[in-house]
Amino acid sequence: MRATWKGVISFGLVSIPVRLYSATQERDVAFHQVRRSDGSRIRYRRVAEADGDEVNYADIAKGYELPDGETVVLTDEDFANLPLSTSRAIDVLEFVPLEQVDPIYFAKSYYVEPDRTGAKPYVLLRDALAASGRVALVKIALRQREQLATLRVRGGVFVLETMVWPDEVRQPDFPFLEEDVAVRPQELSVAASLIHTLAADFDPTRYTDNYREALQAVIDAKVAGREVVASPGGPASEAVGDLMAALRASIAAARAGRPGEAAVAGGAAVAGGAAVADGDAGPAAAGVTDEGPDDKASDDKASDDKASDGRRGGRTSSVKGASSAPGTRSTARKTPSSTRSTAKTNAATKTPPAKTSAAKASAAKTSAAKATSSRTAPKTAPRTPTSKTPPTRRSA
């Protein structure tokens, strides 16, 4: 590694000579700008605006433009002679708890290495700082600007974390912060269950840069002359509709992807016995199912017979069709599930009614009797297709 800064740590009357090294490096794939047709590199020249002449890098300085358009030129010597104690020193201001420093202030990390002559005071300060459980708040001048920073211990060495100034932290000004967004306790409970399901110890080595790997694979395929196969796109982003359903599905997916976690079908259960019902349970949750009619009425059924079936609302069963085959069907206001199953079986095997004018006439004359029968105890009513007299009612 190449040192990016040299100076001292100023700690009271103690000065520790140190060097800074960048603690991180980006692994992005590097590209050059080229001409599309032949891949020829695009080059830029430093040209003076006044005369168009190319300027050597050694002749370039920094300029500050005044409001009237005039420019003040500053050289490297001007920056080197700044009247700042932090230009070549890390000034320790105070020692603060790390948890009180909001991570939003952190900018860049540097390793701090001691010079040969400063190894002992370096180790002394390192061990004392580690035992205190605090971090040193310091000031340092880097790249022509003074910065706040923290000094902490990591892996036996000091790590300098540069920080932004408080007036450089932007404040969120979002409209929803002014709105009264209500969150129900049931929703909060399910969200907490999802967090519990995904809880883990921090281990960044488990994750990789999938985009960079895919990009490198495309480059390698281009070099080898292979065809680049486009990967299928991810799921399209959709607006959140049923929030509770989305949370439950997320819990089920998270548990299914973890060993030892039972997958929750449809997100019906949550960790720790937290309630998942949102108070608006559908018919299935309450044990209620939609029940259609046992069978469809014949096209030849009389209109008054249809009206009588509509009043029953599917809750009772009666003999349908005036010319049905003789038989009995139980009727009741509250039919158990076993009875309903039997009734449906009977309905499935019912013979079609005979299409005779006599049967239609019989059905018209006996509609009142059938309506009364549907509201009373179970009865059977054998029908004689050719008879015009009301059928004899017998007990089941």
From Swiss-Prot:
GO terms for biological process: DNA recombination; double-strand break repair via nonhomologous end joining. Pfam families: Ku. GO terms for molecular function: double-stranded DNA binding. Keywords: DNA damage, DNA recombination, DNA repair, DNA-binding. InterPro entries: Ku70/Ku80_beta-barrel_dom, Prok_Ku, SPOC-like_C_dom_sf. Residues 278-288, 337-396 have a biased composition (Low complexity). It comes from the Bacteria. Gene3D superfamilies: 2.40.290.10. Residues 9-189 form the Ku domain. Residues 315-336 have a biased composition (Polar residues). Residues 294-312 have a biased composition (Basic and acidic residues). Residues 278-396 are annotated as: Disordered. With LigD forms a non-homologous end joining (NHEJ) DNA repair enzyme, which repairs dsDNA breaks with reduced fidelity. Binds linear dsDNA with 5'- and 3'- overhangs but not closed circular dsDNA nor ssDNA. Recruits and stimulates the ligase activity of LigD. Belongs to the prokaryotic Ku family. This is Non-homologous end joining protein Ku. It comes from Frankia casuarinae (strain DSM 45818 / CECT 9043 / HFP020203 / CcI3). The lineage of its organism: Bacteria, Bacillati, Actinomycetota, Actinomycetes, Frankiales. The gene is ku.
